[in-house]
Amino acid sequence: MLTLARQQQRQNIRWLLCLSVLMLLALLLSLCAGEQWISPGDWFTPRGELFVWQIRLPRTLAVLLVGAALAISGAVMQALFENPLAEPGLLGVSNGAGVGLIAAVLLGQGQLPNWALGLCAIAGALIITLILLRFARRHLSTSRLLLAGVALGIICSALMTWAIYFSTSVDLRQLMYWMMGGFGGVDWRQSWLMLALIPVLLWICCQSRPMNMLALGEISARQLGLPLWFWRNVLVAATGWMVGVSVALAGAIGFIGLVIPHILRLCGLTDHRVLLPGCALAGASALLLADIVARLALAAAELPIGVVTATLGAPVFIWLLLKARR
């Protein structure tokens, strides 16, 4: 038994090391790749100062943090709701952030600065989160809380559709670009949003013990002494914050929160002591690679990153599911 535990521990360490190396390689490639390839030896030249440090580095850091946040949010929701299909958009938090951002674009007539749009997106996500916490205080079951989140998401989606229908051509272009996701407008002015993600990411990665209990189910978690009501509130609030900040940075991005945790579980990473940091590393790597494809796929334009993640991720996910069944 001890030998099996040690083998599993070594395997987990190997996985984390491999994911760390993959993330570092993706980070380096992201800094080098673009309309002009800039190798690491040229990073400190005047050309590298502009393209690498002023343009690519803030974008790369934003992609890395958003990918980690979305993947960890998916892992938290899948444990919290005991549903492998749970992901950040499921509770309506992503759509809530979208409603806040769309309201800011329409009411501000496209004149609001980026920091104001970011605050509105975060506010929209937190409002939906507060409504969910209100439901949670009524001690609803996990399944009913999940259904409440789905209903809120549908309402927010309807509001966004109405807003797009009545928007002007200029606003519509900005809204459609946001709905497909993208990091094209990210620079050092959004560094405060990046910093807002880091403490929550680190805190959740340290909460493996309650997460492992939650993954056992509500009844088992209560029997083990976990204050279920408290942890549900805290985790829903933390997820709402991460999703709101991510939407403020990059718009709506699918696939990462749904598929990354599921793929890692299929690979044998079920202990949240390994799964949570693994999700952060894998989510960051996947979104970095998708962002590189979005930048380089077309010569004259940039693809929406949400389209890239769905196109590349869905076939891989289906293949892994078929392989696991065999």
UniProtKB/Swiss-Prot annotation:
Spell out the subunit comment: The complex is composed of two ATP-binding proteins (BtuD), two transmembrane proteins (BtuC) and a solute-binding protein (BtuF).
Q: Which residues cross the membrane?
A: 15-35, 61-81, 88-108, 112-132, 146-166, 184-204, 240-260, 274-294, 302-322
Q: Which Pfam families match?
A: FecCD (PF01032)
Could you mention a single GO BP entry for this protein? cobalamin transport
- Protein's name in the database: Vitamin B12 import system permease protein BtuC
Location in the cell: Cell inner membrane
Q: Main role?
A: Part of the ABC transporter complex BtuCDF involved in vitamin B12 import. Involved in the translocation of the substrate across the membrane.
The UniProt keywords, alphabetically, are: Cell inner membrane, Cell membrane, Membrane, Transmembrane, Transmembrane helix, Transport
Instruction: Say which species the protein is native to.
Output: Escherichia coli O9:H4 (strain HS)
Q: Name one GO molecular function term.
A: vitamin transmembrane transporter activity
